[in-house]
Regions:
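Residues in the short beta-alpha loop(s) of Rossmann-like NAD(P)-binding domains
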Residues: 18, 158-162, 237
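Short helix-loop-beta connector
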Residues: 122-128, 225-227
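Rossmann-like adenosine-cofactor binding region
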Residues: 179-254
Length: 290
């Protein structure tokens, strides 16, 4: 890819650590080239304790915006001047828009999830979800699904550090949305079975089953699956986890996190540029072989 950079070229970037593996620079630079937009997207390896300095530098230099990956998603919310409703509830963000020095924090991971589900031909608005996990990806999904109109969400997590934080987020969602959200201890399989039985969608928001530990699965009892259930795994390496493989064998429709990644990027791109990312081109060029 060749790009002619001038004194007018705007800056977009990714902050976090590590970032060298990220497909975001390729996605966003390709999108800008396709649409004739004069931006360049770079990746900067920035540890959490250096985020404040990095943000002030980007603000001062007039960068149009940036994405944030781990470990900076929580601290970035505190560094922003304004936060979106989803970011305020979750306490995390993955996108910053810089409007003349005023920084607004957004989270587009949940937006990417909702679009990926719709892309699979599944409508979960007004229906019930069972969500496994309460970390960053799961929280983004939880918040956006509740804001967008999913009727009921049962969240299952072990009693770790995320559990107490999840209790606070669940309380906010029950207060501010029409969605009924309940947090459960993952240790009770019968409660989980009952939740899945009348859910339209089961989401694995954890890293269980990710490469290289591909034979691990978060659902060990496959009798919990039913043919009306859509099973979504945020993992995209491998494309088909053991969870998805066994769900498919049980007659479930399935989807992975590959297009969630694409569509969260498209949502960030729209916030910065006001333009729709040419997702079909990006999908074909960077995601067809994943």
């Amino acid at each position: 890819m060749s790009k002619h950079i001038t004194g007018h070229t705007g800056l977009l970037c990714l902050l976090g650590s590590p970032v060298a593996h990220s497909v975001s620079p390729e996605m966003h630079n390709e999108a800008c080239d396709q649409l004739g937009l004069d931006y360049s997207y770079l990746a900067f390896d920035v540890p959490e304790d250096k985020m404040p300095q990095a943000v002030e530098g980007l603000r001062t230099m007039g960068a149009r915006g940036w994405n944030i990956t781990m470990p900076g998603k929580n601290i970035m919310c505190k560094l922003a001047d304004k936060v979106s409703p989803a970011s305020e509830i979750s306490g995390a963000c993955n996108t910053i828009v810089n409007d003349n020095g005023v920084l607004t924090a957004y989270t587009t991971d949940g937006v990417g999830f909702m679009r990926a589900v719709a892309e699979n031909g599944v409508d979960i608005i007004g229906k019930k979800m069972t969500l496994l996990g309460a970390g960053g990806a799961a929280t983004a999904i939880l918040v956006q699904a509740a804001l967008d109109g999913v009727a009921e969400i049962n969240v299952f997590n072990v009693r770790d550090n995320f559990f107490a934080r999840a209790e606070e987020i669940v309380a906010k969602l029950n207060e501010r949305t029409e969605c009924k959200v309940t947090l459960h201890d993952f240790s009770d399989p019968e409660v989980l079975r009952a939740s899945i039985a009348d859910s339209a969608i089961l989401v694995n928001g954890t890293s269980v089953g990710m490469a290289p530990k591909t034979e691990n699965t978060i659902i060990t009892d496959t009798t919990m699956f039913h043919k009306d259930l859509f099973v979504f795994d945020v993992i995209y390496n491998p494309q088909e986890t053991r969870l998805l493989r066994e769900a498919k064998e049980a007659g479930c429709k399935t989807g992975n996190g590959m297009y969630m990644l694409l569509y969260q990027g498209a949502a960030s791109f729209k916030l910065w540029t006001g333009e729709d990312m040419p997702v079909e081109i990006i999908k074909e060029k960077y995601f067809s072989g994943k």
